[in-house]
A protein has these predicted regions:
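Short beta-strand/loop segment that forms part of the nucleotide-sugar
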Residues: 32-42, 63-68, 93
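Glycine-rich, basic loop-to-helix element that forms the pyrophosphate-binding segment
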Residues: 67-83, 90
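Membrane-interface aromatic/basic loop that binds lipid-linked glycans or pyrophosphate carriers
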Residues: 271-345
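Donor-binding/catalytic cores of nucleotide-activated saccharide
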Residues: 96-201, 205, 220-227
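Catalytic core of nucleotide-sugar-dependent glycosyltransferases
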Residues: 210-218, 224-254, 258, 262-297
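A conserved acidic beta->alpha catalytic loop
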Residues: 22, 40-49, 70, 92
Length: 345
């Protein structure tokens, strides 16, 4: 069996059928054996029934499992344990695969001697229109064999390689017996955690400078405040720091500074999405981040990596370095006010 497509499912009745159709239509046209693993994580809408209906329609392709609120990370890991394919494909249940997704991957697997990981671009999709999220990530060529060190550097420098859905990889790259229950509380950064594991075991990489996956916009930190955003990513930082010697990157500290400070910039920015009871509570939240041991070390490098940081984030980081919480809060409130006035016009 060539591909196992793992689809975590939770309360996505509005999008699930479209997602599954984008996968099944391609599989039915393939000569290679594939399976779809649907893991329903205790959905309270009709998602579970939709999974069962598709299982009845395509019994030779689909396997369905019903679990009870294990969270996205553990649900995905459960799917991995059930997988039988040589390669793993991840597809979130509200997203879509491009029409030539599998055709392109099969061609790449054959022509490049079955690489450990194939990385590809993604579209941002709003249900009607789509645009490329990132391109030329690892090369400007259409297809490239990429050194592992280049992949690791890009992973640390930005978000373009974070998504677990932006690559297919051999099942042997997964440490299937690793206990992820200690990370079950992680509300953000679960993709990064798993990518770190994959990078540990993958040696050969091919990059396709082509968008094969459609990520549906409308959820996540752009619309919702998560009080555990930074603490979740701190788990990721610790895992990366543990691999400093193993990864052998000459500019490791520089790259990790970018990773840490970019994350803090986002953590600060998203605080404006919360209706704080008072200034004191908002300040305490910022203060906890500022006093964190990892940030205390890496915020000293803000001047060194300033060209790699989003300008709006850089301003907040400079203020945070100087403990100017009041200034940060004022700027965030002004941003909210500006947007409100713009919407009323």
């Amino acid at each position: 069996m060539l591909f196992s497509i793992v689809v975590p499912v939770y309360n996505v009745e509005k999008y699930l059928q479209e997602c599954l159709d984008s996968i099944i239509k391609q599989i039915l046209q393939m000569s290679e054996a594939c399976e779809i693993i649907l893991v329903d994580d205790g959905s309270t809408d009709s998602s579970g029934k939709i999974c069962d209906r598709y299982k009845t329609m395509y019994p030779d392709i689909i396997r369905v499992f019903h679990n009870s609120n294990h969270g996205l990370l553990m649900t995905r890991r459960f799917g991995y344990k059930k997988a039988k394919g040589e390669y793993i494909v991840n597809c979130d249940s509200d997203d879509l695969l491009e029409l030539d997704f599998f055709k392109t991957l099969v061609k790449t697997i054959r022509e490049y001697s079955r690489p450990d990981m194939i990385i590809f671009n993604q579209y941002l999709y709003d249900g009607w229109n789509k645009k490329v999220a990132f391109d030329n990530i690892l090369s400007e060529k259409d297809v490239s064999v990429v050194p592992k060190q280049d992949v690791l550097r890009q992973f640390l420098m930005g978000n373009s390689l974070v998504s677990i859905c932006g690559a297919t990889y051999k099942r042997t790259c997964i440490d299937i017996n690793k206990d992820y229950s200690m990370y079950a509380h992680v509300s953000n950064g679960e993709d990064s955690l798993q990518k770190i594991e994959l990078f540990d075991h993958a040696d050969t990489f091919v990059y396709l400078n082509k968008a094969l996956y459609n990520y549906r916009m409308g959820s996540g930190m752009t619309t919702k405040f998560d009080a555990n955003y930074y603490s979740s990513f701190k788990v990721v930082f610790k895992e990366i720091i543990r691999r400093k010697e193993k990864w052998s990157l000459s500019d490791f500290e520089y790259l990790l500074s970018i990773k840490v400070l970019s994350t803090v910039g986002r953590a600060i920015t998203q605080t404006r999405l919360k209706k704080w009871k008072n200034y004191k509570d908002h300040k305490k939240y910022l203060q906890r981040i500022r006093e964190d041991d990892i940030l205390t070390e890496y915020i000293e490098n803000v001047d060194m990596i300033k060209r790699q940081i989003q300008k709006s984030h850089l301003i907040f980081l400079i203020l945070l370095k100087k403990y100017l919480y009041c200034m940060i809060i004022v700027l965030l409130n002004l941003k909210n006010l500006s947007e409100k006035i713009g919407m009323e016009k």
